[in-house]
């Protein structure tokens, strides 16, 4: 029922949900559970129910021409490297399950995989997911129909998932010294003015659930992340008492690894043994192995002993 995908970020669990052997319709209320207010295109759509109730939104959208590409304000836009079937869904409710996500998108068309990103140790949802459709037209229809839909007071953002590699390098920021009362909306207000935030995650105390003053903020573009660093690093934001530290998450990871190695007393790697040349003392560089030179070989290492 579950398949593990590859190429995961550190500490993150990505499960591919395979719906083929599961009957979802029996677990969800019918259309009466759907609370639909207004239409698409700026309207307000609230799906407080699950399953078929949420998923029926896609049936309200007209078919999309194969010549049109509606990114829905997504991350790729005209980037031809984007996968035409793989979507990223941001701002999911914290308690949303893979079954509910599948039911929401399934009526837009057949789905290959459907997965909510979670911490592999705690199961904590990072609030975003990937949905891979069988066809590009169904993926386009899902963006047009479900982008902006409100589910349990969360307004979903549905767009094309960006490819990995260089296109997303240096877009993830590590932020410290945030107020211990910071909320997602306040974090969005501080960083949102510098670009399109793809993902944000406030780290919380495992026991109390309160913010630890640390967060990760991922932007859509490298330039947006650099602008946020230039504008906010060593700056005291409104409501805070100390200046923020804002740097690339990759740099933070390298610094943390270096500090850990030093604590273990490992330090930097030792210098290589020099090659023979002027001033080379062979007796010094042969080391302790030189004392075993005259020992007789073990019988197992001398086949002639057994002949």
Curated annotation (Swiss-Prot):
Coiled coil: none annotated. It is found in: Nucleus. Keywords: Nucleus, Repeat, RNA-binding. The keyword Metal-binding does not apply. It comes from the Eukaryota. InterPro entries: Euk_RNA-bind_prot, Hud_Sxl_RNA, Nucleotide-bd_a/b_plait_sf, RBD_domain_sf, RRM_dom, Sxl. This is Sex-lethal homolog. Its main location: nucleus. Signal peptide: none annotated. Gene3D superfamilies: 3.30.70.330. GO terms for molecular function: mRNA binding. Pfam families: RRM_1. GO terms for biological process: alternative mRNA splicing, via spliceosome; sex determination. Residues 285-307 are annotated as: Disordered. GO terms for cellular component: nucleus; ribonucleoprotein complex. Residues 85-163, 171-251 form the RRM domain. It comes from Chrysomya rufifacies. Unknown; apparently not involved in somatic sex determination. Disulfide bonds: none annotated. Residues 285-299 have a biased composition (Basic residues). NCBIfam families: sex-lethal.
């Amino acid at each position: 029922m579950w398949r593990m995908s590859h190429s995961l970020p550190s500490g993150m669990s990505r499960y591919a949900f395979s719906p083929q052997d599961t009957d979802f319709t029996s677990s969800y209320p019918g259309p009466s559970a759907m609370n639909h207010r207004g239409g698409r295109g700026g309207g307000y759509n609230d799906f407080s129910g699950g399953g078929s109730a949420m998923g029926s939104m896609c049936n309200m959208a007209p078919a999309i021409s194969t010549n049109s590409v509606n990114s829905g304000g997504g991350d790729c836009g005209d980037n031809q490297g984007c996968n035409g079937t793989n979507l990223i869904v941001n701002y999911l409710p914290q308690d949303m399950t893979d079954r509910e996500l599948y039911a929401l998108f399934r009526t837009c068309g057949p789905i290959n995989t459907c997965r909510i990103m979670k911490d592999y140790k705690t199961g904590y949802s990072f609030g975003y997911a990937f949905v891979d459709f069988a066809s590009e037209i169904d993926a386009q229809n899902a963006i047009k129909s479900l982008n902006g839909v409100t589910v349990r007071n969360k307004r979903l953002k549905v767009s094309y998932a960006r490819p990995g590699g260089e296109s997303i390098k240096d877009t993830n920021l590590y932020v410290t010294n945030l107020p211990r009362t910071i909320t997602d909306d306040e974090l969005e207000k501080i960083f949102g003015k510098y670009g399109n935030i793809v993902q944000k995650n406030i780290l919380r105390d495992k026991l109390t659930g309160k913010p630890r003053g640390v967060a990760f903020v991922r932007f859509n573009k490298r330039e947006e992340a650099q602008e946020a660093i230039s504008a906010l690093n060593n700056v005291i934001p409104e409501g805070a008492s100390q200046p923020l530290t804002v740097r690339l998450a990759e740099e933070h990871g390298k610094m943390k690894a270096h500090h850990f190695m030093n604590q273990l007393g490992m330090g930097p790697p030792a210098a290589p043994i020099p090659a023979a040349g002027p001033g080379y003392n062979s007796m010094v560089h042969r080391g302790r192995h030189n004392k075993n030179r005259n020992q007789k070989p073990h019988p197992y290492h001398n086949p002639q002993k057994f002949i």
